[in-house]
Amino acid sequence: ILDVKYYVLLPSASYIGSSLDNVQWSTILRSVSGEGGFQMSYGQRPKPREIAQFLILDNRMPRSLIFCANKIVSNLQYLQKDAEQAPPSSAMANRLLMLEKDIDQIFDDGLHEYIQNFLLQNAELARQVEVDYRFYR
């Protein structure tokens, strides 16, 4: 959702900060049931960087990327507790946590690039979990 908002929804860069831009950001929060949690954490007037921070790096938001990555690591630790050796998916999941940066660095490096990299690593992790735990079709 963030990637689409960032690249597709605004007709041009001149609309950044406009009422259209602000409505779109608020709609994103509502679409992930995050408006109330965001307002409790950041206040009433949403700013794009704060919304991105909330949806990517805020562990208090159950749909944030970092919250989900932490849950993946936790669940894989549970699955491997009786294993003699940690499977490759364990290290891959921990690498997802290492993608955590501050939001300014993410915006400086490129939000689109960050999200694409996260999605790519998440897809590779999913394939490895399938192999490690024999979730074949």
Where in this protein do the model-derived segments appear?
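Alpha-helical transmembrane segments and their helix-helix packing motifs
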Residues: 1-137
